[in-house]
């Protein structure tokens, strides 16, 4: 699997002091250029992007992470009232905090399926952070 992400660094980051519970996010990052966040669908992980990251890394600084509760990322044991700790809002908050920790104040996002719903929520909750967004395999809804 490492050959799929040549030139990328794999890391895990703990996001604490969060209204949605503590979470460990696993992600890979690398490349050069504008920051681009890739968000996977259900029931996948960041590895779903392995066929395109090599092409993207020459034009973008690519970040591809596992959403909370997917892949190697670990979310809180308790889902909270109405499963708020695993909501799109919680996942959007995670990704914004991850990108902040990497030093990116604004960035582009591509999301598929559950990742697309998370990207849509990011646009609603953090409109100054998301420069452009591409979402596919969803119809945005009230979430």
Q: Where are the model-predicted features located?
A:
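Alpha/beta-hydrolase fold catalytic core
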Residues: 1-35, 58-60, 85-86
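Active-site loop/oxyanion-hole signature of alpha/beta-hydrolase fold enzymes
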Residues: 19-20, 28, 67-111, 140
């Amino acid at each position: 699997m490492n050959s799929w992400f040549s030139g990328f660094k794999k890391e895990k980051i703990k996001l604490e002091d969060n209204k949605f519970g503590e979470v460990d996010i696993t992600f890979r990052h690398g490349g050069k250029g504008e920051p681009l966040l890739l968000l996977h669908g259900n029931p996948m992980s960041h590895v779903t992007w392995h066929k395109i990251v090599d092409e993207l890394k020459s034009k973008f600084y690519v970040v591809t992470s596992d959403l909370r509760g997917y892949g190697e990322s670990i979310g809180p044991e308790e889902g909270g009232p109405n499963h708020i700790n695993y909501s799109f809002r919680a996942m959007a908050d995670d990704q914004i905090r991850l990108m902040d920790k990497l030093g990116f104040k604004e960035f582009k996002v591509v999301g598929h399926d559950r990742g697309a719903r998370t990207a849509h929520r990011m646009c609603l909750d953090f409109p100054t952070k998301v420069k452009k967004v591409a979402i596919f395999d969803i119809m945005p809804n009230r979430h």
